[in-house]
From Swiss-Prot:
Organism, scientific name: Rattus norvegicus (Rat)
Function noted in UniProt: Plays an important role in the regulation of embryonic development, cell proliferation and cell differentiation. Required for normal branching morphogenesis. May play a role in wound healing.
Pfam families in UniProt: FGF
Gene3D superfamilies noted in UniProt: 2.80.10.50
PROSITE patterns: HBGF_FGF
GO MF: chemoattractant activity; fibroblast growth factor receptor binding; growth factor activity; heparin binding; type 2 fibroblast growth factor receptor binding
Organism placement in taxonomy: Eukaryota, Metazoa, Chordata, Craniata, Vertebrata
Protein name: Fibroblast growth factor 10
InterPro entries: Fibroblast_GF_fam, IL1/FGF
Matching SUPFAM superfamilies: Cytokine
Length: 215
């Protein structure tokens, strides 16, 4: 490169004095690094800009995605556990399930019966506890399939809640089975509780419609 500059300078300005050629050479030589430096900056700056913008966009992207993921996790957890509902369980046989102040479980036709107001609490995923608000008894089923009211929450009070195809709910004992079959909460055509051994999931006597209680 330097050889090119000297040769062409001499041929381009043959009539200039030697001192003028020297000054001209010095000027050309001093301008070359500046040009190279500017050219280098032009070549590097777009890549640096893209790199910084991509890193900033990636950090902003992660800052937006993280809270939403956490929010989804928290909302899912609250939905699955700790849910509390006040309901009346209206059976397919046209009775409201009630637990009287002596702990007796039966059905009633009276819509305003205070013992039919129930608090349904999710204790595990798909498992609930049903408690009569005015008698303070939990709905329970023992290993023989008998329904009774329990003052204390125990394993007999855990019921598996399932929404059936017809829109009604079924409640099966979480801990007890009969010959490998689920035992269900059920009221017969007279409003009396049925033994769990005689119930099946498809029996309409075991189907209940949760009705919202308005305060």
């Amino acid at each position: 490169m330097w050889k090119w500059i000297l040769t062409h300078c001499a041929s381009a300005f043959p009539h200039l004095p030697g001192c003028c050629c020297c000054f001209l050479l010095l000027f050309l030589v001093s301008s070359v690094p500046v040009t190279c430096q500017a050219l280098g900056q032009d070549m590097v700056s777009p890549e640096a800009t893209n790199s910084s913008s991509s890193s900033s966009s990636s950090s902003s992207s992660s800052s937006f995605s993280s809270p939403s993921s956490a929010g989804r996790h928290v909302r899912s957890y609250n939905h699955l556990q700790g849910d509390v509902r006040w309901r009346k369980l209206f059976s397919f046989t046209k009775y409201f399930l009630k637990i009287e102040k002596n702990g007796k479980v039966s059905g009633t036709k009276k819509e305003n019966c205070p013992y039919s107001i129930l608090e349904i609490t999710s204790v595990e995923i798909g498992v609930v506890a049903v408690k009569a608000i005015n008698s303070n008894y939990y709905l329970a089923m023992n290993k023989k399939g008998k329904l009774y009211g329990s003052k204390e929450f125990n394993n007999d009070c855990k019921l598996k809640e399932r929404i059936e195809e017809n829109g009604y709910n079924t409640y099966a004992s979480f801990n007890w089975q009969h010959n490998g079959r689920q035992m269900y909460v059920a009221l017969n055509g007279k409003g009396a509780p049925r033994r769990g051994q005689k119930t099946r999931r498809k029996n309409t006597s075991a189907h209940f419609l949760p009705m919202v209680v308005h305060s």
